[in-house]
Amino acid sequence: MFGQPYVQDCEYVCITEGPLDAMWLTQLGFPAVALLGMSMSEKQRDLVLTLPTKEVILCLDNDSAGQIGKKRAMELLGNKIKVSHINIPEEYKDVQDIKSYDILSKVIKNKRYW
């Protein structure tokens, strides 16, 4: 999982599909890791559960594959950790497309719980 060693104690961690998305979020001050694909594996779930955080925010791409990935991650994480997800506005493909800190911050703030 990309970025896992760099996550320090934090309230939440954003989970993205790709490393560029995770780097973009980290650059803007949002702790993030990347799955390196659309779907979380059981091994990745186990790694997520070792992260020093109380919540994960699923920030997967704004396409059908991202929706499938959200569902899979939720099934794997279940009630093991607090899980939420963001709704990326239609005009953006993924979090890296959101160049405004203010917009991205609002999207993350408006996360939804399952």
Located regions from the model:
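Glycine-/acidic-rich phosphate or pyrophosphate-binding loops and their flanking alpha/beta elements
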Residues: M1-E11
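TOPRIM fold recognition
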Residues: C10-V13, A22-W114
